[in-house]
Amino acid sequence: MTPILAAEALTYAFPGGVKALDDLSLAVPQGESLAILGPNGAGKSTLLLHLNGTLRPQSGRVLLGGTATGHSRKDLTDWRRRVGLVLQDADDQLFAATVFEDVSFGPLNLGLSEAEARARVEEALAALSISDLRDRPTHMLSGGQKRRVAIAGAVAMRPEVLLLDEPTAGLDLAGTEQLLTLLHGLRAAGMTLVFSTHDVELAAALADRVALFRTGRVLAEGAAAAVLSDRATLAQGGLRPPLVIDLALSRARSRPFGPRSALPRTRDALAAQMAGWTRR
């Protein structure tokens, strides 16, 4: 099946010659959740900015639905309608006076009628469980609320792919769990998710697939359980397996565990397997 979004041999260097992306290729399967995992400075955010057309590669190309993208005004408008982006700092994304006005901006700029734009906004606010915030001034929102409003603004465009840069940055535990529930809901509704993170626990909880980055290159890419259980490769990126996978791997040293695909990736899955261990 043709990937919904793909990067082919992307290279991009900042002024001074430091390469953020170094001949990087990556495919995003439709309907899946892909984690772009790696330490700070690995090129994760730079890739996302290429995947929605904000940055133009110095070499290589981005394909959307198998077709090479262009950077004309018309091409970019269509591209950003199909591929939404939520920035790491929601304050960089919110600019209207109220939540409703902010979420309305994208649909209105698509040329939709006021009635259709309003319907999309109401739908997005409901999907993100923030309908009660519709008239709230954006500067009076909490960090978690701002993040959800920024996501609602992208969702209101009805994109095929949603890109999220460090989606849980700055959120407390409760805010992170609420956001995970919302993102799982978008994923279950068929939206393709691509998110950058340095948090292996988040990658385990949300991703179907993981691409491990280091200095603008892909070190490893594959099913989440396989990549997140590969200690040696994770160490090259300055990371280690998530706690739930680490505990399961430790158990497997004394008793065969089974295929890596069966490794638990959430606390609930680990608890269920631990209950099975005590019965054996």
Curated annotation (Swiss-Prot):
SUPFAM superfamilies: P-loop containing nucleoside triphosphate hydrolases
GO cellular component: ATP-binding cassette (ABC) transporter complex
Record's subcellular location: Cell inner membrane
InterPro entries: AAA+_ATPase (IPR003593), ABC_transporter-like_ATP-bd (IPR003439), ABC_transporter-like_CS (IPR017871), ABC_transpr_CbiO/EcfA_su (IPR015856), Co_trans_ATP-bd (IPR005876), ECF_ABC_transporter_ATP-bd (IPR050095), P-loop_NTPase (IPR027417)
Gene3D superfamilies: P-loop containing nucleotide triphosphate hydrolases (3.40.50.300)
GO BP field: cobalamin biosynthetic process; cobalt ion transport
Molecular-function annotations in GO: ATP binding; ATP hydrolysis activity; ATPase-coupled transmembrane transporter activity
Coiled-coil regions listed in the entry: none
Matches recorded under Pfam families: ABC_tran (PF00005)
Record: residues binding ATP: 38-45
Chain ranges of the ABC transporter domain: 5-240
PROSITE patterns, A to Z: ABC_TRANSPORTER_1, ABC_TRANSPORTER_2
EC number: 7.2.2.-
Keyword Coiled coil among UniProt keywords: no
SMART domains per the UniProt record, alphabetical: AAA (SM00382)
Keyword terms: ATP-binding, Cell inner membrane, Cell membrane, Cobalamin biosynthesis, Cobalt, Cobalt transport, Ion transport, Membrane, Nucleotide-binding, Translocase, Transport
Membrane topology annotation: Peripheral membrane protein
Oligomeric form and interacting partners: Forms an energy-coupling factor (ECF) transporter complex composed of an ATP-binding protein (A component, CbiO), a transmembrane protein (T component, CbiQ) and 2 possible substrate-capture proteins (S components, CbiM and CbiN) of unknown stoichimetry. Subcomplexes composed of CbiMQO can be isolated from membranes but the CbiN subunit is not isolated in association with them, suggesting it is only loosely associated. Expression of just CbiMN in E.coli confers some cobalt uptake.
PANTHER family from the UniProt entry: ENERGY-COUPLING FACTOR TRANSPORTER ATP-BINDING PROTEIN ECFA1, HEAVY METAL TRANSPORTER
Identification of the protein by name: Cobalt import ATP-binding protein CbiO
The organism of origin for this protein: Rhodobacter capsulatus (strain ATCC BAA-309 / NBRC 16581 / SB1003)
Organism taxonomic ancestry: Bacteria, Pseudomonadati, Pseudomonadota, Alphaproteobacteria, Rhodobacterales
